[in-house]
């Protein structure tokens, strides 16, 4: 049964399309008549949060987006950053949260497919993927099913397409029970002088449809992604798209081959709102109109209506504006790769978006008002109150420090993620230098003997909830720090801002404050935001997720032979901590997982110290003086030392004698701007003298060697015991053995 194009427009139909009464009135004022059913669908798709950023645009404009290496900032399919020698890195992160909750395998798979398309649409060959995943509490009845489906979906698509997954995050919290997060990142490499944009240029040029055929999957997907969930969630399953990574691989090769011919004027992938969004964006950006003839669109289902074709989110599709004389050559390339190639319209000079189906004009709308002049809101917001200070002396010390550390490394959130990343192909393409499990993934740049890129994705949602401003700063700082810990120079970042319902002032306040914090940190660290995505309405039955502004960054290693890892220390090396003694236990995992409390403020991020300490650590690594390096984050110094010992298989003998403060704060405090370095014994004094000269605080902590982590008389844990505890939680959880392994 198809939907006829003449369907009465009722208040229920308008509300069902996610349009508020005042927005519908704006449509009437704009076009001077009642919209057709297809036009209503087009407005609904273009004016929802997912496509228009109407609640967030005002604040996103405040982010720093320029820098000496930035070739293309936000507004295109992905950001583009110069990496020298005529090369650039193209990258972006994007959410596929709502679809992944409804249909975890396909939701996650098409999230990966969509972000890869964003990268190769720009003319770049994808070289790395990451994903940041948040699930509900481990003992929630749906969590295991969702983890299994999402991880299979991410792996199934990425592995088949042929891109290595080099990093990411997996976290559990009850606040994601009804609304998981799947944030997918991809990066590719292109020539700086061969970047392809989505802005159409020239009148009367062919608009070409490329790739897979159009079906009914995903109709209304963008609208679904702009609404809160409720009990009717099962009914939304048809709005999840279905992906085919092999078609996408062919699409990648065909696009890159066609781009070499000079035929491509503009190109846009079909993502949210499919044909509607890609056509409107290409025309509106180039100040051109677009005429589409739907009878020419390749379809895989019969009797599809204009409404369905315009809003389908079938995967593996592109829209392109071509040089007319290259039409035959272009068609031959796509046919060779077994893909559809159809001229479905042309550019016009009237700034109208016109759609014709079966001889009938089913839409005729002002293209600018759909695209870059969509509604924009300045929503009311209020700052959230900050938790009271929590001095370390008010926090109980553990009865047994070794037990407390085992509990942390074997907990749901600090345990090894090996079960997850072993399902991903981390080595395909043969350029992976650092795999998941360290501070950042590192990938060699093909064709260069020494150059590599480092990638990391970070956010600490519990900090953001306690203090959105400091939490926003911390997400950026930790990403920058993880990249720095490999020896790379952080170049730029992409953001994926996941929040609840922006119509609630307290949620909008979280968003505004987090964006302000992100902006301040990016400016202080010269780490511009070049692309990104906002996902709002992440709520179920009125319960919002933890505010989760994920930051993914890229760094450049001019010489990867000097790169640092977390597990490459040698026997006899000296252990040095860079940064201040641990003192901050508010919002720490020690507080949460050992003492079962979520009190206290988030740690403050001193951006001057962050930069000074990070620049110093990078110089030590680049001077070939560091044998290993690890940043200190969740779990504090104790967890960082345990992770280094487990990664290297070598023990550590630690003496806190130089440190000032209570032992539980020194070991489990989550103060920022800190690293652990191991250096050969004969350069330890030299490194410390240089630190002093640079005004960088440091502590000599001890020596590498033996088969246990020993901290004064507080902790003595054999590495094997640490590893067994660290590695067992995830497999035990997925196989349903014991409720929580470490408890």
UniProtKB/Swiss-Prot annotation:
SUPFAM superfamilies: PurM C-terminal domain-like (SSF56042), PurM N-terminal domain-like (SSF55326)
Major site of localization recorded for this protein: cytoplasm
Positions annotated to bind Mg(2+) 2: 118, 269
Key words, A-Z: ATP-binding, Cytoplasm, Ligase, Magnesium, Metal-binding, Nucleotide-binding, Purine biosynthesis
GO biological process: 'de novo' IMP biosynthetic process
UniProt-annotated binding residues for ATP: 53, 92, 495, 532
Residues noted as binding substrate in the record, renumbered to the chain: 95-98, 117, 241, 313-315, 535
One of the record's GO cellular component terms: cytoplasm
Highest taxon in the source lineage: Bacteria
Pathway: Purine metabolism; IMP biosynthesis via de novo pathway; 5-amino-1-(5-phospho-D-ribosyl)imidazole from N(2)-formyl-N(1)-(5-phospho-D-ribosyl)glycinamide: step 1/2
Enzyme Commission number(s): 6.3.5.3
Binding residues for Mg(2+) 1: 94, 533
Pfam families for the chain: AIRS, AIRS_C, FGAR-AT_linker
InterPro entries named in the record: PRibForGlyAmidine_synth_PurL (IPR010074), PurL_linker (IPR041609), PurM-like_C_dom (IPR010918), PurM-like_C_sf (IPR036676), PurM-like_N (IPR016188), PurM-like_N_sf (IPR036921)
NCBIfam families noted in UniProt: FGAM_synth_II, PRK01213.1
Biological role stated in the UniProt entry: Part of the phosphoribosylformylglycinamidine synthase complex involved in the purines biosynthetic pathway. Catalyzes the ATP-dependent conversion of formylglycinamide ribonucleotide (FGAR) and glutamine to yield formylglycinamidine ribonucleotide (FGAM) and glutamate. The FGAM synthase complex is composed of three subunits. PurQ produces an ammonia molecule by converting glutamine to glutamate. PurL transfers the ammonia molecule to FGAR to form FGAM in an ATP-dependent manner.
Family (UniProt): Belongs to the FGAMS family.
Subunit text: Monomer. Part of the FGAM synthase complex composed of 1 PurL, 1 PurQ and 2 PurS subunits.
UniProt protein name: Phosphoribosylformylglycinamidine synthase subunit PurL
Lineage, top ranks: Bacteria, Pseudomonadati, Pseudomonadota, Alphaproteobacteria, Hyphomicrobiales
């Amino acid at each position: 049964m198809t939907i006829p194009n003449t369907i009465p427009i009722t208040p229920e139909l308008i509300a069902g399309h996610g349009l508020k009464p005042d927005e519908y009135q704006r449509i009437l004022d704009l076009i001077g008549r009642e919209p057709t059913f297809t036009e209503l669908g087009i407005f609904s798709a273009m004016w929802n949060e997912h496509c228009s950023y109407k609640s967030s645009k005002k604040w996103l404009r405040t982010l720093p987006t320029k820098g000496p290496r930035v070739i293309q900032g936000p507004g295109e399919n992905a950001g583009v950053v110069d990496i020298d020698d005529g090369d650039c890195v193209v990258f972006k992160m994007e959410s596929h949260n709502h679809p992944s909750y409804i249909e975890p395998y396909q939701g996650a798979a098409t999230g990966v497919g969509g972000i890869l398309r964003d990268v190769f649409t720009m003319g770049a060959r994808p070289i790395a993927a990451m994903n940041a995943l948040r699930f509900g509490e481990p003992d929630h009845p749906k969590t295991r099913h969702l983890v299994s489906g999402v991880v299979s979906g991410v792996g199934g698509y990425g592995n088949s397409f042929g891109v290595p997954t080099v990093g990411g995050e997996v976290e559990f919290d009850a606040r994601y029970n009804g609304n998981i997060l799947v944030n997918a990142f991809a990066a590719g490499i292109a020539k700086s002088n061969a970047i392809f944009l989505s802005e159409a240029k020239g009148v009367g040029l062919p608009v070409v449809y490329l790739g897979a055929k159009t079906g009914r999957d995903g109709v209304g997907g963008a609208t679904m992604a702009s609404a809160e969930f409720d009990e009717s969630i099962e009914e939304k399953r048809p709005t999840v798209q279905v992906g085919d990574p092999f078609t996408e691989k062919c699409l990648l090769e065909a696009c890159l081959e066609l781009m070499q011919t000079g035929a491509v004027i503009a190109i846009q992938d079909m993502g949210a709102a499919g044909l509607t969004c890609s056509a409107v964006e290409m025309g509106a950006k180039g100040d051109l109109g677009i005429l589409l003839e739907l009878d020419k669109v390749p379809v895989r289902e019969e009797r599809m209506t204009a409404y369905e074709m315009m809003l389908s989110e079938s995967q593996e599709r592109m829209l392109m504006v071509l040089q007319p004389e290259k039409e035959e050559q272009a068609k031959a390339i796509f046919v060779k790769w077994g893909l559809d190639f159809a001229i479905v319209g042309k550019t016009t000079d009237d700034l109208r978006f016109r759609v014709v189906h079966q001889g009938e004009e089913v839409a005729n709308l002002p293209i600018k008002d759909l695209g870059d002049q969509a509604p924009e809101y300045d929503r009311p917001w209020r700052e959230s109150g900050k938790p009271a200070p929590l001095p370390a002396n008010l926090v109980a010390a553990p009865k047994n420090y070794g037990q407390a550390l085992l509990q942390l490394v074997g907990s749901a959130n600090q345990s090894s993620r090996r079960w997850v990343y072993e399902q991903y192909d981390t080595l395909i393409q043969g350029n992976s230098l650092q795999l998941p499990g360290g501070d950042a993934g590192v990938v060699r740049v093909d064709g260069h003997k020494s150059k590599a890129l480092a990638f990391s994705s970070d956010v600490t949602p519990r900090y953001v909830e306690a203090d959105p401003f400091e939490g926003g700063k911390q997400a950026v700082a930790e990403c920058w720090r993880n990249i720095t810990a490999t020896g790379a120079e952080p170049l730029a970042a992409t953001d994926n801002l996941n929040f609840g319902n922006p119509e609630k002032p307290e949620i909008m306040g979280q968003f505004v404050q987090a964006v302000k914090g992100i902006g301040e940190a990016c400016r202080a660290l010269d780490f511009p935001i070049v692309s990104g995505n906002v996902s709002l309405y992440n709520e179920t039955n009125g319960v919002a997720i933890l505010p989760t502004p994920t930051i993914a960054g890229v760094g450049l290693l001019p010489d990867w032979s000097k790169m640092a890892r977390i597990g490459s220390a040698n026997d006899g090396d000296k252990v040095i901590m860079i940064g201040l003694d641990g003192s901050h236990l508010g919002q720490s995992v020690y507080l949460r997982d050992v003492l079962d409390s979520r009190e206290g403020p988030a740690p403050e991020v001193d951006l001057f110290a962050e930069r000074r300490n990070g620049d110093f650590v990078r110089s030590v690594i680049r001077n070939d003086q560091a044998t290993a390096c690890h940043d200190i984050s969740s779990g504090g110094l104790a967890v960082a030392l345990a992770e280094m010992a487990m990664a290297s298989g070598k023990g550590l003998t630690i003496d806190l004698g130089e440190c000032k403060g209570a032992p539980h704060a020194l070991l489990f405090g989550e103060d920022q701007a800190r690293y652990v370095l191991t250096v050969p014994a004969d350069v330890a004094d030299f490194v410390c003298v240089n630190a002093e000269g640079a005004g960088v605080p440091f502590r000599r902590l001890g020596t590498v060697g033996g088969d246990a982590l020993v901290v004064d008389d507080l902790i003595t844990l054999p590495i094997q015991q640490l590893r067994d505890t660290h590695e067992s939680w995830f497999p035990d959880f997925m196989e349903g053995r014991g409720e929580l392994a470490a408890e």
